[in-house]
Amino acid sequence: MNQRIQLASIDDQRNAAAREAVRRRISWPVNLTPANVTYHSRGHVLLLGRAASVSSAARALQGRGLASLTLLTTDVAVDLPATSEPVTAHLLSTHQQPQLRIAGHLGGFRTTLAQADGDALNLAQALIERDVFDVVLDLTEGALDVAAWELPPPGYLRLAWERQEAERADVLESVTELVGEFDKPRYFQVNTDLCAHSSSGNVGCTRCLDVCPADAIASIQGRIESRIEIDPFLCQGVGSCTSACPTGAIEFRLPETRRQQ
């Protein structure tokens, strides 16, 4: 009768210790994270500003391969006939304008109006039956505080229509070019073991949160501790977070050189 050979307990302990040591040396999120992020834009454009500026910009964009044009005006309503693409217009009342918020990036701009009941109205769903807009052309000249960005995300373009006449053609051309798929390097990697943001449920270092101009870094509350997360679609590689990080937990990663075929 065959007997099962019992392994010495010391072998089990050594093997377990070795496996644990290897596991700790591997940073799974870093190793499995792709080097690039991809934006997908179908060309649904939101234009925001005074009626005269928005109408002029929309007419210049008509017939240039965009999927739709949505006009949000802040003074009077407009009625712009559709040509090759659908055109939708909506007048933001003086009450609605402070409630407008825009968040996201190229191919994924969520535009909402705060409601009295606490729910937010998704304007893309209400106006064009989509979840998001792909591109935003902001012609408000800062009159509306729709987002907290110091550095706007890809796909969000600003233009003072009356004062920047010389730049109109270039900005409008940029809008038409933001249709399709676009790759951008993932500029960072985070070692959570080194991060001093939270320990034992207490929030510690917040330097990276304070310095990011793209508002790409957030503190995410876990079951016990908080952790730092960087949105790769908002990060634009400024690198202020890596300079501010006292522990080296955030490392700037240069784009990989393409191999010659």
What are these regions (language model features)?
Residues 197, 229-230:
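A generic structural signal for short
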Residues 62, 149, 203-228, 236, ...:
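Iron-sulfur cluster-binding cysteine motifs and their immediate structural context
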Residues 1-218, 261:
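Ferredoxin-type iron-sulfur electron-transfer modules and their immediate structural context
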